[in-house]
């Protein structure tokens, strides 16, 4: 009996030992099998995804170009270096107004520009920059992110094979620099002016000869008399361009109350990113866009003071009521005509009009009422 008990203990111990050895061997096999998978995952994390971005702006262009750099820096930092975006300026790619085409074709994964530059390809893109007598920046951002604007922008750009995202706002722009004073509608007849977007179509109705010129060529065109007037941005950037040296009349705005730039992303390239990098890129673009708006406001305020102090020869003017009324009427007629011809145009116009009607009531009772009562 004692011997049987000893035998049973030996068998039990052996069984446990065999089981432990078997489990150990199995665990080792699982570890060996898992190792390549972990190595592959780690390798994927270490792979650096390098994209190229083409921008309309020249090398070192302030504010607009700075927003692109900020976005790229954020993507690299938030991804832990897994994704990098290399920026080509217009000085390199030589196609300042061809950004959409290059991103669509896959020459660049990303672009940064203003969507009204290709209104000739699709007039609906103008809505995502700005429209004359339209929303101001806070209203427009609210429309983009909470009022259906992003969905409408996606519908328009889907057929281009491109995703579009807000890329920075200039705020309310000035009406432009003029070689001569504008007092009547007759003064607009035959006037050669650089002004893009729907505003250019409005002024064409009033007799202005409208042209679109790349940013890097504006100063020379105005200085040489190729054009008589130009609209660029506002004090934040206009003083850097030197327009105050060659055109004495600086008019307040009507045409671009909230000009939004765009980040464009090749759809196939974006869809091919891992989800976490898609999210990082989206967040970086949104942050850079609103940061540019704050920077534009700051620089405009600082440079406006410089105009008053350093350039007393610059004469600030507002277009006479007669001209503003004619602009509004031409704008209304063109909008109605385009909406009747294009259902997509009408859908976006109806959306913006309804949202502005709602939001403007709050703007009037909040910002406008406060400013009206507190302006010195």
Model-found features: residue ranges?
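C-terminal motif of bacterial Sec signal peptides marking the signal peptidase cleavage site
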Residues: 22-25
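N-terminal secretory/targeting leader peptides
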Residues: 27-140, 152, 157-159, 163-376
């Amino acid at each position: 009996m004692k011997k049987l008990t000893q035998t049973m203990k030996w068998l039990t111990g052996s069984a446990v030992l065999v089981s432990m050895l078997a489990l150990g061997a199995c665990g080792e096999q699982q570890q060996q099998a898992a190792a390549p998978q972990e190595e592959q995952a780690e390798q994927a994390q270490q792979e650096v995804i390098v994209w190229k971005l083409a921008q309309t702006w020249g090398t070192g262009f302030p504010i607009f170009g700075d927003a692109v750099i900020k976005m790229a820096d954020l993507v690299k930092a938030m991804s832990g270096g897994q994704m990098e975006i290399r920026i080509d300026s217009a000085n390199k790619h030589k196609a300042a107004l061809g950004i959409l085409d290059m991103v669509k074709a896959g020459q660049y994964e990303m672009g940064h520009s203003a969507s009204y530059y290709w209104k000739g390809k699709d007039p609906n893109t103008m809505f995502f920059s700005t429209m004359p007598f339209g929303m101001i920046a806070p209203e427009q951002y609210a429309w983009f992110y909470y009022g259906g604007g992003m969905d409408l922008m996606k519908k328009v750009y889907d057929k281009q094979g491109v995703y579009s995202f807000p890329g920075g706002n200039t705020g309310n722009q000035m009406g432009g620099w003029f070689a001569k004073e504008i007092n009547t509608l007759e003064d607009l007849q035959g006037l050669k002016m650089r002004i893009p977007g729907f505003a250019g179509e409005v002024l064409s109705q009033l007799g202005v000869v409208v042209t679109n010129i790349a940013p890097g060529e504006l100063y020379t065109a105005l200085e040489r008399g190729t054009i008589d007037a130009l609209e660029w941005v506002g004090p934040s950037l206009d003083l850097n361009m030197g327009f105050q040296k060659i055109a004495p009349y600086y008019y307040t705005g009507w045409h671009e109350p909230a000009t939004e730039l765009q980040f464009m992303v090749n759809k196939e390239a974006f869809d091919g990113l891992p989800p976490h990098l898609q999210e990082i890129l989206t967040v970086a673009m949104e942050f850079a866009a609103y940061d540019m708006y704050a920077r534009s406001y700051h620089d405009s305020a600082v440079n406006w003071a410089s105009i008053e102090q350093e350039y007393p020869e610059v004469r600030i003017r507002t277009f006479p009521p007669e001209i503003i009324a004619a602009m509004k009427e031409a704008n209304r007629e063109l909008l109605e005509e385009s909406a009747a011809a294009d259902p997509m145009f009408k859908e976006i116009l109806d959306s913006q009009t309804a949202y502005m009607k709602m939001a403007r009531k709050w703007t009037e009772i909040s910002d406008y009422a406060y400013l009206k009562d507190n302006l010195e």
